[in-house]
């Protein structure tokens, strides 16, 4: 995978054990997501990708969650796995917690995976309740780009 402005990131999907030296890196996220897909009974397929983003890394704008969801969607699609958006979010959270080494929650991944304006109830983190929030920006004089 090549992300614009970053060096090439290559990860062998046949080697899915956590690599402590990769903690905090893109490789850790990719490997962790692939490992979680495998643990869920899927065979992660190799892929090549060129990635660009307007989300600044480390900006507090959920750049890692957006990246995790991207990788999850790629693997889900290529393998015809059938994971739902909340399940892809949970896969991303697992990768970030266990492989990347950051004890994050599930909100950013869920918001990124589901999209739109939503309400999320995490009373049961294994089965978050997600509700769309109807809002008409134009009727309030706003435009969302």
Task: Kindly label every feature range from the protein language model.
Residues 77-145:
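ATP-dependent small-molecule kinase catalytic core of the GHMP/sugar-kinase superfamily
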Residues 1-91:
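Anion-binding (especially nucleotide phosphate/pyrophosphate-binding) glycine-rich loop
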